Design a protein with these regions (language model features):
Chain A
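N-terminal secretory signal peptides that target proteins for export/translocation
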Residues: 1-9
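C-terminal motif of bacterial Sec signal peptides marking the signal peptidase cleavage site
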Residues: 21-24
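Glycine-centered tight beta-turn/hairpin loop motif at sheet-sheet or coil-to-beta transitions
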Residues: 165-169
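A short beta-strand micro-motif
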Residues: 160-164
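Sec-dependent signal peptide recognition
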Residues: 10-18
Length: 211, 692
């Protein structure tokens, strides 16, 4: 897994933009920490089962704040194949990690850049019957194209909004389900269950804006 | 083994015919071709002069077929205006008419339906052009005469009939690239009231491979045989009798199964049909016609290892039909046709546990009314009653109005439908390697209950209804025909097809092991509309130009609504960012080209004995799959580029019985190895023809 901090890239490339961003933050509230915009590439979330068999294997737990995979209870979301869990609510199966936080989430329709506020009324936690991020083709973040391509493609214009395990907010866009995010993935030759996504993390408690 | 026997038979009969060729060639070879007043049978189920037709139609003549150099139906059909062939599994080719998918065009041989739509599409490359007299194409829904499947239109292949007295023969041999061989022996004999005719055609090829090193060929080697045996007897006042037997057999390496090392893939197709047609003029004004028809199609796909068969897929379909019709003519030139009959269709198929049998009765009526010299109105209606679906009532009205001798207006409205096929009703298919299940609506309740009882079901969204409706369309055509001069006909036709209840596969559930469960439902509405222009021109005696153009818009109604609601986005392939699409970014349905252009040039040289034919077929850009993550085809998707395919044929008469042909297909060697798998590039063919 590789992380790229977009803000530090921007800092090097375009100091002016950063200054504007910073200034706008300062104008709102001088004590706020700056938001973090990140890209995560090749996060592996593999099942150990064969196709057609019950899914098995550990969920890969991720922390927006730590910008990495974590082992403890401070995870915000967890991945296994196409399933995404939030660290809030109840587990639907025994092999899921137990929920210890207050995380929640929903799927927003809209371009990543245009979704700048959290609609708290839409937030849902995982439960025994449904996940905050719905599973199934066309229901949540992906489409399963079926035969003959069998591709899993992240639906364009689906932004995942999360409340983290400790009550901060993040927005996230999944860009690819295949290793190295190929331009034209092939389900038969490209390694699947490997996520590339970008996210924006709002580290300030209670702030619902990503501006 | 049977085909080897038949191959020997062909060889033997060919030798006999060739050795006899000089003895029997007594007929005068007429250089002059007299343009007979062409008639069409498909539009009215009875002969009607082509120029008087009220519906958009096209005839491909025997001469055009022979001069073109083509061997199979798909090749010549794809050169027609507004027709595109679409590749399916294993080198099969379906037809797209007025932008409507291959499942929805009825294919007939001598007026009787061809069956064997294994995956919905009827493979036109199955049909040989050897011994074809002409091909009739009707555009627009025609269920008022033909019932199910005639939603986009009808293609009727008319095979050669015996006309002349005495012993006739026609033999040819064609050799081409990829070791493609096409051989025909056609013999007929007529004496007074009795005629017998038979022909046998063998077509084989080594196939070709566009992408080497992927372990499988693009089109595998195959050989097939098409045979026909017919008897004709004129019993004077008792009428005419036609008895016809046709067969098709094909062996192909490779199947729908994925190729693996050490495993041999084999595909075998057997098709047999027999028809008895009885015609009698009961009185001066009444004609009786009875068709009795039985056809059987068997396809076997096998994966074979040295110690046995490891995987098998069988498809065994049969259809029996009786169609009785009476035509009553009046003195004014008007006539009405009344017909009735029944169909019985059966299927045995791997992954279908039941052996479904469909029975239907039908009744149709058509009135061809010549109100005066200028106005011809044809109206008809057909009623189909089916043991498994709700009955269908299919009307059609069409007219032709002559403003003058040079200018006329044609218009038609027709209803077309297609009953759900056996797959959509009875399939119970489980793919263990990629993990999904497909269930037909008639078996879904049973299977779901079983899964529930075994605690194997995670969720199931119950189908709104397990009663699939027939897919149907309302089709409208309006056209002008204008003779600029008697030699320059120009035709423009506007069309619109509103298609309802399109059947789609949807996810309905999931098993506890993660397998997705698919089923079928009537969801989509779509339309196709466009303009078709065609004409021909004889500027000088030895030169003929003909051309056509089609503008096509084919769209899904739900997709249009999604785009309008602003919920459709696309992902940029480089930046991976999503952006919102606007209404006008929606391109339309897959595999449809907005523009299609055909141009033909024919030179007659050497005192009308020989000819050169050039054809240019342009197909505008089209999309095959969504490439930017929104399940729709939009302007930012990857398209297959617009391209021209050009053919040239040279026909040379050596003596009055011998001629030859050089045919180069795809002269400029246009290829797209990834997307156009049905195009192997440039192909050379050489053909020798012996006849009398």
């Amino acid at each position: 897994m590789i992380l790229i901090n977009i803000r530090s890239m921007i800092k090097k490339l375009n100091l002016l933009l950063l200054t504007l961003l910073f200034v706008s933050c300062v104008d709102d509230d001088p004590v706020l920490e700056p938001i973090e915009a990140m890209i995560v590439t090749n996060l592996e979330a593999k099942t150990t089962s064969q196709p057609g068999q019950p899914l098995s294997g550990d969920f890969v737990k991720f922390s927006f704040e730590k910008q990495t995979v974590v082992e403890g209870d401070d995870w915000d979301i967890a991945f296994r194949a196409t399933t995404i869990l939030v660290n809030g609510g109840f587990a639907a199966a025994d092999d899921e990690p137990s929920r210890t936080g207050i995380a929640a989430g929903y799927v927003a329709v809209g371009a990543y850049g245009s979704i700048n506020n959290v609609d708290e009324s839409l937030l849902k936690q995982d439960s025994e019957t449904a996940y905050a991020v719905p599973t199934g083709s066309g229901n949540g973040w992906y489409n399963y194209e079926g035969p003959p391509t069998h591709l899993i493609t992240p639906i364009a214009g689906r932004t995942l909004i999360f409340k983290t395990h400790n009550g901060r907010y993040a927005k996230m866009e999944i860009q690819s389900y295949y290793k190295d995010a190929p331009e034209s993935p092939n389900a038969f030759t490209d390694e699947a269950q490997v996520y590339t996504f970008n996210y924006t993390y709002q580290p300030n408690e209670g702030v619902i804006s990503f501006d | 083994m049977r085909s080897k026997y038949i191959s020997k038979l062909i060889l033997l009969s060919t030798i006999i015919v060739i050795s006899n060729i000089n003895v029997f060639s007594q007929n005068e070879d007429s250089i002059k071709t007299i343009e007979m007043k062409e008639v069409m049978v498909s539009a009215n189920k009875t002969e009607k002069p082509f120029v008087e037709l009220t519906v958009p139609a096209k005839i491909i003549s025997k001469k055009e077929i022979e001069n073109s150099g083509h061997s199979r139906l798909d090749e010549i059909i794809s050169e027609q205006v507004g027709i595109i062939t679409v590749p399916g599994f294993g080198g099969s080719e379906g037809v797209q008419l007025q932008g409507i998918d291959p499942e929805y065009t009825l294919i007939l041989i001598d007026g009787l339906p061809v069956i064997g739509r294994v995956a919905g599409t009827l493979d036109l490359s199955r049909i040989s052009l050897a011994s074809v007299e002409k091909i009739e194409i009707i555009k627009g829904a025609s269920s008022s005469l033909y019932g199910s499947e005639a939603l986009g239109g009808v293609i009727n292949i008319i095979t050669r009939k015996v006309k002349d007295e005495g012993f006739k023969k026609n033999v040819y041999y064609q050799y081409g690239s990829y070791n493609t061989q096409d051989i025909l022996t056609d013999i007929s004999f007529r004496k007074n009231k009795f005629a017998v005719f038979g022909n046998i055609n063998r077509y084989s090829s080594n196939g070709y491979d566009l992408i080497e090193g992927d372990g499988q060929k693009t089109v595998e080697a195959f050989q097939n045989i098409t045979g026909n045996l017919g008897l004709y007897y004129n019993m004077n006042k008792l009428g005419n009798l036609n008895l016809n037997y046709k067969l098709f057999e094909e062996d192909r390496d490779g199947t729908v199964f994925i190729t693996s090392p050490g495993i041999e893939n084999k595909s075998e197709t057997n098709e047999n049909n027999i028809s008895l047609i009885y015609q009698n003029k009961l009185s001066k004004s009444v004609d009786l016609n009875i068709d009795i028809y039985k056809t059987k199609y068997l396809n076997k796909e096998q994966q074979v290892v040295p110690n046995g068969i490891i995987n098998e897929n069988n498809f065994d379909q049969s259809l029996s039909r009786v169609d009785v019709r009476l035509k009553h003519s009046t003195s004014s030139g008007s006539y009405y046709t009344i017909g009735f009959g029944y169909d019985n269709e059966k299927l045995e198929r791997t992954n279908i546990s039941v052996k479904p049998e469909h029975k239907s009765q039908f009744l149709y009526f058509q009135y061809d009314w010549k109100t005066n010299n200028k106005f011809n109105l044809v109206s008809g209606i057909r009623y189909d009653s089916h043991n498994k679906y709700s009955s269908q009532l299919s009307p059609k009205v069409s007219f032709k109005y002559d403003f003058s001798e040079d200018l006329n207006l044609k218009g038609s409205f027709g209803y077309g439908y297609k009953t759900p096929d056996f797959r959509q009703l009875y399939l119970n298919f489980s793919n263990s390697t990629s993990g999904y299940i497909v269930l037909g609506v008639s078996v879904i309740d049973e299977v779901i209950t079983e899964l529930q009882n075994n605690n194997e079901l995670m969720f199931y969204d119950e189908l709104f209804t397990t009663n699939l409706l027939a897919e149907n369309s309302n089709s409208y055509n309006l056209g002008l025909q204008y003779y600029v001069t008697p030699d320059i006909p120009l035709e423009i036709n506007l069309f619109r097809n509103n298609i309802y209840n399109l059947i789609e596969t949807n996810i309905v559930g999931r098993k506890t092991n993660g397998q997705t469960i698919y089923s079928y439902s009537n969801v989509n509405k779509a339309f196709t509309q466009g303009i078709e222009i065609q004409g021909s021109w004889n500027p000088i005696k030895i030169l003929t130009l003909d051309g056509g153009y089609q503008l096509l818009y084919a769209k899904d109604i739900e997709a249009i609504e999604s785009f309008q609601s602003g919920t459709v986005f696309a992902r940029d392939r480089i930046t991976k960012q999503s952006f919102e699409l606007k209404s006008n970014d929606y391109f339309g349905l897959y595999s449809r080209s907005r523009h299609q252009l055909n141009l033909g040039v024919s030179f007659i040289i050497n005192q009308i004995r020989d000819n050169i034919n050039l054809r240019f077929n342009y197909r505008g850009k089209f999309g095959l799959v969504d490439t930017n993550n929104n399940s729709f085809l939009d302007r930012y998707d990857n398209f297959i580029k617009g391209h021209v395919l050009s053919n040239i044929s040279f026909n040379k008469v050596i003596t009055k019985n011998i001629s030859f042909q050089i045919f180069i297909k795809n002269i400029f060697n246009y290829k797209d190895e990834v997307n156009l798998v049905n195009n192997p590039g440039r192909i050379y063919n050489f053909k020798v023809i012996l006849n009398n």
